[in-house]
Amino acid sequence: MKKTVPYINNLKGNRVISMMTAYDYPTAKAVSEAEIDIILVGDSLAQVVLGHDDTLSVTVDEMLHHVKAVTNAKPSSLVVADMPYLSYHINVSDSLKNAGRFIQEGRADAVKVEGGEKRKEVINALIDAEIPVMGHLGLTPQSKNLMGGYKIQGKTLDLAKKLFEDALLLQETGCFAIVLEGVPTIVAQSISENLTIPTIGIGAGKYTDGQVLVIHDLIGMKSKEYIDAKFVKRYGEQYDSTVKALVEYKKDIENSDFPGEEHSYDMGSDIQDSLKEWKKE
């Protein structure tokens, strides 16, 4: 069954919502097979796939390339496309065109936008254009320069109140769900309990309506120099197992153990004899 926006909305209060990032066809197939509710094609691909230092460098065209790869897998999960930096910051017209491309060309089911009150006009326009919108509050990575880095948000009473107000505003504006990132557990819990739409937490404690992680963090597809955030739990060590497989492959070809007979194609003995005679000519 293909999961839809109304389906996700109806999960609030009934069971925890699962969300996971995916950036390509095989990963989307795996996430769908695991029956994860939502696939986020996150701008985090700028870092974990393209090797940038932050999410600010990825473009709409680059994001669209990966959104198409994910939707080609025809996942049962709801597919949400992250709108990258500057794709919805300049004016409403550009925002509509960019979001429309993710829906029309990328075949995403919804888009995600970072920010609260200052995004109200854009979110209104997107929803008026029949584009479902997921909000994102708290530690919003596209604002890292203003925040002075990746810092936990809402740690004072005034900042917690602002997050609460922004969450209510996003709900009133028409967002179908909100990601809460990098906020104290009690703040995320309070927001979640006072909204009628689902909240999806990442570094926001266990009392949100759902959880999301970056899949490269979850499966351990990161080299040794990367240090996991506090909120990450690894469920695998894919990087290490990949390196191990590559080392074994290299050893096998150097020792002529691969390819073996079972990996090779043969031809009839009469044709082989003819080929040998032809080579002698």
Where do the language-model regions lie?
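Alpha/beta enzyme core
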Residues: 2-236, 240-281
